[in-house]
Amino acid sequence: MPAPTNTFKSALASGDLLLGCWAGFADPYATEVLATAGYDWLVIDGEHAPNDLRSISAQLAVLRGQHSHPVVRLPMGEPWLIKQVLDAGAQTLLIPMVESAEEARDLVRAMRYPPDGIRGSGAALARASHFADIPDYIATANDQMCLLVQVETRAGIDALDEILAVDGVDGVFIGPSDLAADMGHMGDASQADVAETIEDALARIRTAGRAAGILALDDATIRRYRDWGANFLAVGIDVVMLAQTARQTLAKWRTDD
């Protein structure tokens, strides 16, 4: 029996538009609720949300069998950390601040068993292999790994074509906020030079045959990124949605006469 098929990876490769949402509460119950909305993918955020290995593992568990595919964003691309979340059952990783083809190649290798990589083979301890109940897991897992790298600096943009040429990079996610900050526009990704850079990057990603991803929260920007070619598009953040709805509801009834 082989490793479970990563249907998100195959959908990305086909160019389907996949709509996602950030799961930032670091809580399995909240992530399970979010999955009932039917998003194609959910980011379990280990970079800016208060997640650790146990909370990530718990969220992976509640998403098993759900339509929403878990994308685990790690705080960094360290091989030991990659190994742990893959053993916990993740198949798709989003790695921030990738700025070179060399970094991308190292990430590809960290996600794969030898001879294609350096992932440790302790699968008997791992949920990923159903605790050794999938006899062919190690032999087949490499083909189901999906690597998404974040390009969010000028250095990353300069190296984009080389990153896209790395075998094993399934998609590139543009980080508008950090890119804008690195270009001298802290907190304002709407500046013309930032927008032009994003549009060009998304086009180059799709031309290279890779999936292009990005996050936006307002309707106009979401439509613009979609029209520019983004095909794994995050359209919400759960923490933001709760905060906005809570404030709007209270404001409405405080002022109602």
Swiss-Prot record:
<keyword id="KW-0670">Pyruvate</keyword>
<dbReference type="GO" id="GO:0016832">
    <property type="term" value="F:aldehyde-lyase activity"/>
</dbReference>
<feature type="binding site">
    <location>
        <position position="152"/>
    </location>
    <ligand>
        <name>a divalent metal cation</name>
    </ligand>
</feature>
<protein>
    <recommendedName>
        <fullName>Hydroxypyruvate/pyruvate aldolase</fullName>
        <ecNumber>4.1.2.-</ecNumber>
    </recommendedName>
</protein>
<dbReference type="InterPro" id="IPR040442">
    <property type="entry name" value="Pyrv_kinase-like_dom_sf"/>
</dbReference>
<dbReference type="GO" id="GO:0005737">
    <property type="term" value="C:cytoplasm"/>
</dbReference>
<dbReference type="InterPro" id="IPR015813">
    <property type="entry name" value="Pyrv/PenolPyrv_kinase-like_dom"/>
</dbReference>
<dbReference type="InterPro" id="IPR050251">
    <property type="entry name" value="HpcH-HpaI_aldolase"/>
</dbReference>
<dbReference type="Pfam" id="PF03328">
    <property type="entry name" value="HpcH_HpaI"/>
</dbReference>
<feature type="site" description="Transition state stabilizer">
    <location>
        <position position="73"/>
    </location>
</feature>
<keyword id="KW-0456">Lyase</keyword>
<feature type="active site" description="Proton acceptor">
    <location>
        <position position="48"/>
    </location>
</feature>
<comment type="function">
    <text>Aldolase which can catalyze in vitro the aldolisation reaction between hydroxypyruvate (HPA) or pyruvate (PA) and D-glyceraldehyde (D-GA). The condensation of hydroxypyruvate and D-glyceraldehyde produces 2-dehydro-D-gluconate as the major product. The condensation of pyruvate and D-glyceraldehyde produces 2-dehydro-3-deoxy-L-galactonate as the major product and 2-dehydro-3-deoxy-D-gluconate.</text>
</comment>
<dbReference type="InterPro" id="IPR005000">
    <property type="entry name" value="Aldolase/citrate-lyase_domain"/>
</dbReference>
<dbReference type="GO" id="GO:0046872">
    <property type="term" value="F:metal ion binding"/>
</dbReference>
<comment type="similarity">
    <text>Belongs to the HpcH/HpaI aldolase family.</text>
</comment>
<feature type="site" description="Increases basicity of active site His">
    <location>
        <position position="87"/>
    </location>
</feature>
<keyword id="KW-0479">Metal-binding</keyword>
<feature type="binding site">
    <location>
        <position position="178"/>
    </location>
    <ligand>
        <name>a divalent metal cation</name>
    </ligand>
</feature>
